[in-house]
Curated annotation (Swiss-Prot):
UniProt xrefs under NCBIfam families: PRK00962.1
Family that this chain belongs to: Belongs to the UPF0254 family.
InterPro entries: HcgF (IPR009625)
Organism for this UniProt entry: Methanopyrus kandleri (strain AV19 / DSM 6324 / JCM 9639 / NBRC 100938)
Protein name (record): UPF0254 protein MK0012
Length: 182
C-alpha cells in the first residue's frame, strides 16, 4: 500500500482529504470528483496537514524555512513565487520523512502563483498554478488559485500513482522534474 502525507498551505488540507476519500472508496458528496475510487485499498493517507505559518513549519516539520516576504494579519507566511517553489519542496520532503510516508506533497502560495511539490525521495515533481493572487490582498483570485492548486495536486498524484509521469511532463504547468537514478 502506498503511504502519502501532505503539508499544505494554500490548499488548506483538501489535497489530503481528497486522496483519503478516494482511498476509502467514498462516493457522492464525500467522494473525490477527480480521483473517484481509483485509490481504494491501494493508498493510505498518513497525515494531511494544513500549515500556513512559519512557526508551524518549524515545529511540525522540523524545517528552517526562509523568513517570509510578508505576513498576513492571521500570521500566515507570504512568500513571493520563487521562494514558494523552494518551500513547497522543503515541505514535501519534510512531511514524507517526518511521517515515514512513501510520498510527500507540499503546497504553498503567497504572492504570485501557487507551488505544488510531490516527492518520494527519488523523484521530485514541481508544479504551479496559472492563477496569480496575493494572500495580503484577498479577492476571488485567492479561491481560484486554491481550487486550481487542489486539482493540479491531485492530477500530479494520480499521474504518479499510475506511473504516467511522461504524460504529466507534457503539461506546461509542471515546471521541474528531478529523478535521482541509481
Amino acid at each position: 500500500m502506498l503511504r502519502v502525507a501532505t503539508a499544505e498551505c494554500f490548499t488548506h488540507g483538501f489535497v489530503g482529504r481528497e486522496i483519503h476519500a478516494s482511498a476509502s472508496g467514498y462516493t457522492g458528496e464525500l467522494g473525490s470528483e477527480i480521483l473517484g475510487t481509483e485509490l481504494e485499498g491501494k493508498v493510505s493517507v498518513v497525515a494531511a496537514c494544513f500549515i500556513p505559518t512559519v512557526s508551524g513549519l518549524r515545529s511540525l516539520l522540523g524545517i528552517d524555512p526562509p523568513e517570509p516576504d510578508e505576513v498576513s494579519k492571521s500570521g500566515a507566511k507570504a512568500y513571493r513565487e520563487e521562494t514558494d517553489r523552494k518551500v513547497a519542496v522543503m515541505m514535501a520532503r519534510a512531511v514524507r520523512e517526518r511521517t515515514g510516508a512513501d510520498v510527500g506533497i507540499g503546497t504553498t502560495a503567497g504572492i504570485g502563483r501557487g507551488a505544488i511539490c510531490l516527492d518520494d525521495g527519488e523523484i521530485t515533481l514541481l508544479g504551479r498554478t496559472d492563477v496569480h493572487a496575493n494572500l495580503l490582498k484577498p479577492d476571488e483570485r485567492i479561491r481560484k488559485r486554491q481550487l486550481q492548486g487542489i486539482k493540479r495536486s491531485l492530477v500530479m498524484f494520480r499521474a504518479y500513482f499510475r506511473c504516467e509521469l511522461d504524460e504529466l511532463l507534457e503539461e506546461e504547468w509542471v515546471e521541474e522534474v528531478t529523478r535521482d537514478l541509481p
